[in-house]
Amino acid sequence: MNKRILVTGSSRGIGKAIALALAQAGFDVVVHARSRIDEANHVADEIRALGRRSDVLMFDVTDRERTKQQLEAFIEQHGAFYGVVLNAGLTRDAAFPALLDDDWDQVISTSLDGFYNVLKPIIMPMIQLRKGGRIVTLSSVSGVMGNRGQVNYSAAKAGLIGATKALSLELAKRKITVNCVAPGLIETEMVTEEVKSHALAMIPMQRLGQANEVAGLVRFLCSDEASYITRQVISVNGGMH
């Protein structure tokens, strides 16, 4: 049986790197995007070029009903997922007094409602399949340490760590591992030169991370070799803490 993994937020950046790394490791991958359907389709084409199957789903993880409909319909047609990588996230940075209500709500909802909305329709079919499984969430160094100008993002990502650890306890006896990867500053199109120059002073390795370095860890956590690793938060941050 081919093992299929859903990667949310995988049309670009770290999510795309994760999707391609999993395909290279022999997994079939379902690519997800909120709106960038053309980019998601391109990633799916790259996965198929590697000899793996790939489908594309498009929904906003904060929309509970839409997410449920899309995932339940997919599972009914294709069967349960072997794994899920929760990568979809959102930043809206500002000093706390300047945060807008929507800045708080959207960042929290994308990470925490997204966790619930995506996993709720997926977990029971995974359990019923009795084949074990892998769940990996993407937190952040901000969720581990806190970061000025990111009270909303730090809260969201710290909450994700707590949810990950709690869920791992419920699923361990089902041979479904649940782990969290916490990247530091990773070189993506979202990182400005100003942010980069400020951040380098805080990174002992004196460089930004690369998306493939995060993807390599996620790939390992989804592998058979990681079957005894669960409830862990593993940082990829160049020694920031």
Show where each model-derived region lies.
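Active-site helix of classical SDR
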Residues: 119, 156, 164
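Substrate-binding pocket helix/loop in short-chain dehydrogenase/reductase
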Residues: 95-96, 100-108, 199
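Residue(s) in the substrate-gating loop at a strand-loop-helix junction
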Residues: 140
